[in-house]
Structure formats: C-alpha cells, structure tokens
C-alpha cells in the first residue's frame, strides 16, 4: 500500500465540469427504469473492521446497466443530441440522432452506458473493448445494437477510437480527458453528481454524515464527480479518500508530481480501474477536493469483493476497491465510513 496525503490548502477549484445534478436528474425523471440505488448500513462488517458505521452505496443495479457509469455516458449522449438539434428534449430529436454515431473505448461499463444512450435516443454507437475486458461486456453491449470492435490495451483502444472518429466523422465520447478535449467528458462527470446527491439525501434523512468517503478511481471520473458535489453541497464535510490499483497509480503519481503523470504497471484484476493515464479534469478537481490517495493490491481487492459478497453485495475487485482502501487505511474507531460498490458482478 502507498498513501499520499494532500496537504495543499483547500480552495474552491475552477473545475472543468458542473458539480450539480439538476440537468441529469431532469433527464432521469423521464426514465421509467430509474430508481435511486440503495445504500445499506453494514453494521456487522463495521464492527469487524473496527469502525463506528459503514454505508455501502450499491450501484450494481443502476438502471439495469450494472454500474454508476449508467449516469454518465447516456446523459452525455442525450445532451450532445440536444445541442446538435437545438432542442431541450432528446426524444424530440430522433431525426438528428439518427445521423450521429458515438464512438468510445471502454473497459466495459462506460461503453455500455454510451451504447444504451445511443439506443434509447436513436443514435448509433461503436464501442472499442480492450483485450482484457471480460466477454460478458461484449455480449451486453452488442445486445443494445451497438457495434463492438476488439482493441489491444486500453490506451491503444482510446487512440483507435480517436482515429475512427476522425476518419468517419463520428463523435468521440471518452470518459477520460486531456488538453484540448474536456467538454464531452465534463458532461459525464456532471452525470455522476446524481450519485452523491442521492447519498446526501440519505444521510440528511438519518441526520448522520460520514467522516470518510472512499472513492475508487480509474481515470478518476467517479472520484472527481462525487467529490466535487460533496465539497459544493454537503453540509458536513468528510475526508475524501481516493483508491487506485497499485498497478495503475496514475492519480497518486500525478498528485505527488504536481502534474499529470502516467501510472504504468502490469494488468490489474481491477479491470475497470486499470487505467494508466488519469483524466485531466478529474486530476484538476481532485487536486483541490481529495484529502488522501491510497493504492491497493489485486489480492486486497479480491478479498474485499469476497467480503462484500458474504454480506449480500455481489461485485468485482473494481467494485470492492473502496472497501479495500478502507481496510488498508484503517481509520479510527469512531469513524463513520461510506464506500461505493461501483458495479455488480461481471455477468450482470
């Protein structure tokens, strides 16, 4: 385990995205399969871990897509269709949508969200899956009607998506960002603020707020989107802890360096977090919003997934990374902790 404490003075960051859920919630209000995901308290596990309380936001059934990513890619597709058509309702823009093809590389869940959004609103999607992505994602994405293309590594697949977009006049919709490419990923992070807003409503009803929030990171979108909403909207501020695979420590390396830095290493069993390059807008936001960065081993993530399964929450090492980070950090006995079970099992 490696840790990094962000001792920089916290200031209101000039974020490259909106940390407000109003627009995605307006879209979700018209979605018949949208319901707030549960956040059970795991009292027995909290006792075992030696903390006061443990809440687990369970994204495994999010809109039948199996992860928090359902909130981001589909919302971005809808917003871009609306912008292209000059309307506010994507359902009223079917003719415009039919002319649009969205292409992205994905470790699985983001591609599924983009593909589902394209299907719902009448566009076309092409998803490039790296060779390490489980076959179950290929089948689920194809079931939406999207075209799936096999790629090599994640970074190679991103480059392939950019090339195909340029060659065919398609719309590249990555959940990562870099200099000159931030507006589209910003829509995805805006969608993720819904998750944090739901948690805030839950804690307000309990009149109990966490002292620690553990957020796993690949390129950093979930961590940045949720952390930004917490900083802007929660009345009681927690310590925000960002967890990465020790085989893909792009954010912790970047925080230490003070600039975006690659996190190279062998493949991780945390497939959805196995990203070697962080998102620019996520890095910039977490620079101000996050308190602690932690890396975890593949073995720790696998054990955390088994522990959650034993408590009725089926997930993967990626989905259990927050719990693994909590166990590694071992906060004080009076800590009230929140984790995000970011995805269900790989088979849906």
Indicate residue ranges for each PLM-predicted region.
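PLP-dependent amino-acid enzyme catalytic core
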Residues: 1-348
């Amino acid at each position: 385990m490696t840790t990094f404490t962000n001792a920089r003075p916290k200031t209101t960051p000039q974020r490259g995205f909106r940390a407000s859920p109003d627009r995605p919630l307006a879209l979700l209000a018209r979605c018949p399969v949208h319901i707030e995901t549960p956040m059970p308290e795991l009292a027995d596990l909290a006792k075992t871990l030696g903390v006061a309380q443990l809440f687990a936001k369970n994204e495994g059934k999010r809109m039948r897509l199996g992860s928090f990513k359902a909130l981001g890619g589909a919302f971005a597709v809808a917003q871009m269709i609306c912008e292209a058509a000059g309307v506010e309702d994507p359902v009223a823009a079917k003719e415009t949508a039919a002319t649009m093809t969205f292409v992205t590389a994905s470790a699985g869940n983001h591609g599924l969200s983009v593909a589902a959004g394209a299907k719902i609103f009448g566009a076309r999607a092409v998803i490039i899956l790296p060779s390490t992505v489980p076959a179950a994602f290929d089948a689920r994405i194809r079931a939406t009607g999207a075209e799936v293309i096999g790629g090599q590594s994640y970074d190679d697949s991103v480059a392939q998506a950019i090339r195909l977009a340029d060659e065919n006049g398609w719309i590249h919709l990555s959940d990562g960002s870099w200099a000159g490419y931030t507006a589209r990923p910003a829509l995805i992070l805006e969608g993720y603020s819904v998750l944090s807003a739901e948690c805030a409503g839950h804690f307000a009803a309990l009149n109990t707020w966490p002292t620690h929030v553990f957020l796993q990171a690949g390129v950093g979108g979930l961590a940045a989107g949720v952390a930004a909403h917490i900083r802007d909207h929660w009345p009681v501020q927690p310590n925000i802890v960002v967890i990465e695979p020790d085989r893909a420590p792009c954010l912790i390396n970047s925080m230490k360096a003070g600039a975006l830095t690659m996190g190279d290493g062998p493949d991780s069993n945390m497939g959805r977090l196995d990203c070697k390059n962080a998102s620019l807008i996520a890095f910039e936001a977490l620079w101000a919003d996050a308190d602690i960065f932690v890396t975890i081993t593949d073995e720790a993530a696998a054990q955390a997934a088994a522990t959650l399964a034993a408590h009725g929450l089926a997930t993967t090492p990626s989905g259990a990374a927050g719990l693994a980070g909590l166990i590694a950090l071992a906060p004080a006995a009076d800590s009230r902790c929140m984790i995000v079970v970011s995805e269900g099992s790989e088979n849906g």
